[in-house]
Amino acid sequence: MKKAGLLFLVMIVIAVVASGIGYWKLTGEESDTLRKIVLEECLPNQQQNQNPSPCAEVKPNAGYVVLKDLNGPLQYLLMPTYRINGTESPLLTDPSTPNFFWLAWQARDFMSKKYGQPVPDRAVSLAINSRTGRTQNHFHIHISCIRPDVREQLDKNLANISSRWLPLPGGLRGHEYLARRVTESELVQRSPFMMLAEEVPEAREHMGSYGLAMVRQSDNSFVLLATQRNLLTLNRASAEEIQDHECEILR
C-alpha cells in the first residue's frame, strides 16, 4: 500500500512539473512568434503589396491567414488576422467569429498543391491544442496528415460514433477522447467550438483545457475529437498527437 501511495504521489509531482514547464514555455518571447508573423509580416505585406508572403494566403476580410509550417513537408497552419490566444478565448463561442475549423478544412488544398497531386480527404486531419498543450500563444489550427494507426482506429469505430459527444472506445494515443459525428452542412453552419461548449457539460467554463481535432470519415461525415487536460494521466490535451507531420499515410 505504501509503495502504491508513493507511486501515486510521484505521478502527481511529475504531472504538476510537466504542467509548469508547459506554462513557462508560453510566457517567453518565442511564444509570440506566430502572432508576429501574422500581424507584422503577412498582413501588412498583403495590404501594402498584395503579396501574402511569408504566408501562403491572407484573407483580411474573412479574418484568417494560412502559413506553411516549418515542421513536415505538408503541414499548414490556419490563424486569425487578429488576437486570439487559443481554445480558452470566449471569442470562439461568439457566433460572429469566423468558423475557423471549416475554413481550415477548405485550406487543405494547400497540402495537395505542395504534394503535387491530390491528398485524399481520409489522409487529412485538423487539430488545435489546449492552453497547456501548445507552444504558441496565437490561435492556430494544424492542417496535416493523420497518423495511420489513428485512421485505422477511427475507421473501425465508424458505427460507434454518433451525433452526440460520447467517449471513443479505447481512446487515442493512450488518452481519453470524446467523439461526435457531424455532417458537412452542420459543420458549415456551426463551429465545433460552439458544439463543444454547448453540448458537453461544464465545457464552456473550461474550454482552455480542451484540445480539438477533426477528421473526415468514409461515409463523408466528419468526426470531431475532444480531449481534456488530465494531469494524473499526463494528458496535456495536445490533439496534435493524432497527426503525423511526415505523412506516412501517403507512402
From Swiss-Prot:
SUPFAM superfamilies: HIT-like. It is found in: Cell inner membrane. It comes from the Bacteria. Pathway: Phospholipid metabolism; CDP-diacylglycerol degradation; phosphatidate from CDP-diacylglycerol: step 1/1. InterPro entries: CDP-diacylglyc_Pase, CDP-diacylglyc_Pase_proteobac, HIT-like_sf. Keywords: Cell inner membrane, Cell membrane, Hydrolase, Lipid biosynthesis, Lipid metabolism, Membrane, Phospholipid biosynthesis, Phospholipid metabolism, Transmembrane, Transmembrane helix. It catalyses: a CDP-1,2-diacyl-sn-glycerol + H2O = a 1,2-diacyl-sn-glycero-3-phosphate + CMP + 2 H(+). GO terms for molecular function: CDP-diacylglycerol diphosphatase activity. It holds the Pfam family CDH. GO terms for cellular component: plasma membrane. Its EC number is 3.6.1.26. NCBIfam families: cdh, PRK05471.1-5, PRK05471.1-6. Belongs to the Cdh family. HAMAP family: Cdh (MF_00319). This is CDP-diacylglycerol pyrophosphatase.
